[in-house]
């Protein structure tokens, strides 16, 4: 890796300053290159005995109108009113899937962005709780400035806050810095698995806990189905596991994470981690990337993260980057897998990864957003 080290030492002053600003770790990249670069996709596959989850590993969310549902909903609502919940929205990444526009600022309908919808949701539940419910955004070097500029004074560091995930540099398959057509190094965000280290390193988690937050709700920016719901929160609190993972019934074409047992432990495995001789279709549910985690467990987390070698096509050429995934939390924290609705008015999975998916799900997303906005308006002005 001597050549790569020399290339890093020779970076121009502006690039080096930007990397320092965003927390680039030179030694970590050199370590990844030495350990992971010589591998291929097979190196990402998990080792050990991998089997489908047991029936008792996955529990369905109770009906809201059942006695149990009403009890759990009340339990969650009381926790919100005590100020014990904070929401962290994953708003980082590379801003590439929506034509170069930061997804938080993409309009769901004219005049209303994903960020607007999350703010309206926060406003509603703050009114219900009669106390500010914290909304925290995990941004990246590519999304942080536009989001902060848009939020302006709304980003007050208490009701609405933000911290950034990590950054690194892409490599060529033979271990040199990948350079763009303009001969610039190619930066990338290092995955949503950065969240635990980044939220702690920024001091954000400590501040939230000082304000009595007990549960951190983690959700993708672009899944507006993953809304605050006292029923889900109550189920998490009642279940006793430090980590709750929302899953939905799998449909053809789903690619991503699902629950498996690895050496007897229930965990989330991404598709690329599942051994080739294991039938993924034997697992009928799919991870929505929505998590509820006990704040104290997140604060005290001490785990050896698995970093993955990911091959991308950048400007039509192969590039290698290294990432970690938030689902790996299940390998360190005892986890409960909660089956939630995928369809209908109570759907908790309405993704919009790109323009095509946004267009396909626009009606469902608009209906959910209308509920947020109506609820927020009623909270401010009365029915």
Question: What positions do the PLM features span?
Answer:
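A conserved hydrophobic position in a structured secondary element of the catalytic/binding core
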Residues: 139, 191, 293
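A general secondary-structure junction signal
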Residues: 139, 164-166, 339-341
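Conserved beta-loop-beta/alpha segment of the NTase-like Rossmann-fold superfamily
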Residues: 154-255
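Catalytic core of tubulin tyrosine ligase-like
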Residues: 208-220, 225-229, 234-382
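N-terminal glycine-rich phosphate-binding loop and ensuing alpha1 helix
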Residues: 1-161, 169, 178-188, 196, ...
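Amphipathic coiled-coil/heptad-repeat helices and related helical stalk/stem segments
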Residues: 72-73, 201, 322
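Solvent-exposed, flexible loop/coil residues
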Residues: 102, 109-112, 173, 203, ...
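Aromatic-residue hotspot detector
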Residues: 148, 162-163, 345-349
């Amino acid at each position: 890796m001597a050549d790569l080290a020399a290339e890093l030492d020779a970076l121009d002053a502006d690039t080096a300053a930007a990397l320092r600003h965003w927390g680039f770790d030179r030694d970590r990249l050199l370590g990844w290159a030495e350990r992971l670069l010589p591998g291929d996709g097979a190196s990402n596959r998990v080792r050990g005995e991998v089997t489908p989850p047991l029936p008792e590993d996955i529990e369905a969310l109770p009906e809201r109108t059942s006695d149990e549902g009403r009890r759990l909903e009340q339990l969650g609502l009381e926790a919100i009113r005590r100020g014990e919940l904070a929401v962290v929205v994953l708003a980082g990444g590379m801003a590439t899937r929506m034509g170069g526009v930061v997804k938080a600022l993409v309009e769901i309908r004219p005049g209303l962005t994903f960020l607007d919808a999350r703010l309206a949701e926060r406003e509603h539940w703050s009114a219900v709780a009669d106390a500010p419910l914290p909304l925290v955004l995990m941004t990246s070097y590519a999304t942080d400035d536009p989001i902060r500029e848009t939020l302006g004074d709304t980003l007050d560091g208490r009701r609405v806050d933000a911290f950034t995930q990590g950054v690194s540099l892409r490599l060529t398959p033979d271990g040199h810095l990948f350079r763009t057509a303009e001969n610039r190094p190619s930066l990338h965000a290092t995955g949503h698995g950065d969240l635990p280290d980044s939220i702690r390193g920024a001091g954000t988690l400590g501040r939230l806990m000082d304000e009595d937050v007990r549960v951190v709700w983690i959700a993708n920016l672009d899944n507006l189905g993953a809304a605050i719901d006292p029923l889900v929160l109550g189920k998490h609190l009642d279940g006793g596991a430090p980590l709750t993972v929302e899953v939905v019934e799998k449909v053809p074409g789903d690619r991503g994470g699902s629950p498996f047992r690895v050496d007897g432990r229930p965990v989330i495995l991404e598709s690329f981690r599942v051994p080739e001789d294991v039938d993924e279709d034997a697992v009928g549910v799919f991870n929505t990337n929505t998590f509820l985690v006990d704040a104290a467990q997140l604060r005290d987390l001490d785990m050896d993260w698995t970093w993955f070698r990911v091959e991308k096509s950048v400007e039509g050429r192969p590039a290698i980057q290294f990432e970690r995934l938030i689902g790996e939390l299940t390998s360190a924290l005892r986890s409960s897998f909660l089956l939630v609705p995928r369809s209908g008015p109570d759907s908790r999975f309405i993704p919009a990864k790109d323009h095509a998916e946004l267009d396909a799900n626009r009606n469902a997303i608009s209906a959910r957003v209308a509920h947020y906005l109506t609820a927020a308006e009623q909270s401010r002005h009365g029915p």
